[in-house]
Amino acid sequence: GAAILVEGTTNGTTADIDGNFEIKIGPGNYTLVVSYVSYKTQRLTSIVVSAGKPTVLNIEMEEAAMELESVQVVAQVKTDTDLSLLRSVRTSIQVVSGISSQQISKTLDKDASEVVKRVPGVTIQDNRFIVVRGLNQRYNNVWLNNAGTPSSETDVKAFSFDVIPSNMIDNLLIYKTGSAENPAEATGGFIKIATKNIPDANFTTAEYSIAYNDRTTLREAYFLPGKTADLAGLGQLQRGLPSGFAADLNKLPTAGRDAEALKLPGQWMAQPTTALPNQKLAIATGHRWNLTGGARLGTLTSLSYSNAYSTRSNMQNYMYERYDTQNQLPVYLYKYNADIYNRDYRIGLMHNWAYQNAYGTKLEFKNLLNVAGIQNSSNTEGWNNYRMSNFRYYSSQYSSRTTYSGQLSGKHNLNGDDNNTLDWNTGFAYANRIEPDRQNWSKKEVSAGVYQYVLPDVPSINELGRLFMNNHEFIYTAGSNWEKKTGIAALNPTFKAGVYAEYKTRNFGERSLTYRNAYGPFSTTQINALPFETLFTESYLGQGKVLSIDEQTNVANNYSAQNLLTAGYAQFTLPVGKVNLTAGLRAEFNRLMLQGYYNASSPVNVDEPEFDLFPSLNSSYNLNEKTLLRLAYSRSMNRPEFREVAPLTYYDFTEKNSVVGNPLLKNASIHNLDLRFEFYPSPTETFTIAAFYKHFTNPIEMVSIGAGSLYSFANALGATNYGVEMELKKSLNFIGLQNFSLNINASLIKSSVEFADTESERTRALQGQSPYVVNAGIYYQNDNKGISANLMYNVMGERILVAAQLNQGVVLVPDIYEMPRHVIDFSFNKKIGKQLELKFGIKDILAQDHRTQQTYDDGNGGSISLANKRYNTGRTVSLGANWKF
């Protein structure tokens, strides 16, 4: 900000991002000198300061007209500050929102999933997946440093934002309208995450935080005994099938199967432990070297480590077959209550290099690695209507997730002309998810309060078995963009063109081993008198004993898939007076390929090549220097994800439901229209209001199949989605609240799905679409005292989690809705000297329940709402410290 000096003294300060400043000085008459780069220096005389009374000054700076001879400047545009972010938002040809590293540093957010919640119009689902304008996360596209990201999940089309530590983010931008230079698969938002770059100066920082959750910390939790490698998030290396274990037990004789079964680990019982406070440690260092000829070289390295516990105690998990209108009672498919425990270890590493010379050449090499190891156990008890009995289900698993993204990129001024630039990018990304040994076992109630081990007659992975799963995804990318700014008469048109290629592969494998009753010479009483783990020793495991092992691997639960995307675009920007027009056309060729099985004798081969054109138009009209009107149109696409077209059935042992793919899914096509008014009363204040409309053809939704907890994916005939969005960033100085500011974003959305004529009586919202989203925050920042604080509020309206499927226009099972939660977060930061900063925060102060529900006809002209899932994750209190060396 501007520098303010009391003339004739050494007393002075600089203005903050909002232009506010405070100088403490005794009574008297003073002269102030105010200066800022490219503005005229101002000298204010006869400033009277009275005892006990603040003197308020409003100073307007005037731009300086400057004529310079040829000067060679080597500079790096700062992209990590609030001011630079707001400038990017205002000058962008698209509607865009974002958050800077400067704002992130004022919070206790540990990863990108928490950071992104602070972006206007954005919410997070399941603490990992982003929702823009209330639209399902499948309609977003996420890029990291100018290249696509791999899916970190095996069963959903989404990028998991919790793999990127917050201290590695330079800025995060969300484009809400399309343009030719961006991928066509971005209907909700196109999210670009930029990691940090060349530092301004050499530095080293260390950060530590500790957190207490009132539902988890210092309470009892249950896990299988851990492994040494768990601490590094690499526990899969010490789990899984033993070396040399047979590839297919069905090919072995009985004695061979028994011998292989004894090689497997015999630990099944989760042991009690105390959930420790969540902790995070991060160390970052940056160095820069000024080279000859004005060139610079910089490197930045960041390492973070965290461990966290979470618990869902007494989680309600009910599924209904129907509602009995005669007796006014629900008929349950199952009625469970569960305790679920998680222990999470993560390591994050970022290592970036950058080189920049005086002739407009910049080279970057960026690397991001995240390793997460999550140990989970669940105890579920309740009524199973299929089996007509009460059961207790026990499940333990370890899952490992690794995500890596590496990119080499460059930008060049052609012929030394910064109006004629070429940039390029090559990238490689990898993600895996490995579950090396999920163990499930159960007990059945045989009389009131008396439970016995379930030794299935028919093999059942849910009742007694082990599951081994692995998923590996690779992405190779390359792209280049050429931009030419020309001066034709009084116009300054810009032409931009580029190409992009992406090749993605996935290999998914699952192996299922189950145990069944061996009908040996043991009575039920004898068996149940034994500790459960004893059943897996040589005396009881094998043919003619208590248990025998079976290979139940289903070939349909394994698949390979590939996707090739090539794209090219041309875009032209023409400023005409107060009007700025940008028109573009993007061409994309996409080929989705998948090799799988319905069953051993019915292979599935998907090969779907398609070519399409995606026009876009972004226009803006500058009503005056502070007011802007935007109008935008674009066509976008939403393609099925690998998992959605793979015919495998995935059973979620925690949630107790199954999801099966649909190889017949079609692409969804969307037309988007946006109108937005923007007002910038000051460099740090904004007010915007927007209207948007989207029409979908063949939208992809998750639907229930028949009665029960089996879900799949299907195309609806069509859908419309329209609404309004308001955003306000306002300093509260005008009402006497110095250093306070207000941020509000609210969206109201109406959506409806189109059905075939035979189903015209059915009306509902688009699956995953919320009718409203509200984000609000009040901020306090006093740079002189080194204090900042904020209070954040968020709510998202009820939305369909799983849509009902129709049969001849009849709803078989009602839609399952995710219900609203009001969330309030608070954080407080205090700087002590120039090196230490303390942070305090409370997340989810209200700690409202997470709920899903269905609504049934009660038979009397009314309706009744029944809860499916209900649980509470509690509130979290955090304390952290950041030290700059």
Give the ranges of each region predicted by the language model:
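C-terminal beta-signal and adjacent terminal beta-strands/loops
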Residues: 519, 795-804, 830-885
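Periplasm-facing N-terminal accessory domains of Gram-negative outer-membrane beta-barrel systems
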Residues: 1-70, 74
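Surface-exposed extracellular loop regions of Gram-negative outer-membrane beta-barrel proteins
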Residues: 148, 432-434, 450-455, 527-548, ...
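Periplasmic N-terminal accessory/gating domains of Gram-negative outer-membrane beta-barrel systems
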Residues: 48, 53, 77-79, 83, ...
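Gram-negative outer-membrane beta-barrel transporters
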Residues: 691-696, 712-803
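Transmembrane beta-barrel wall of Gram-negative outer-membrane proteins
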Residues: 262-378, 404, 617
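Outer membrane beta-barrel strand-and-loop segments of large Gram-negative receptors
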Residues: 467, 471, 478-479, 527, ...
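Signature of Gram-negative outer-membrane beta-barrel scaffolds
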Residues: 372, 463-465, 469, 481-626, ...
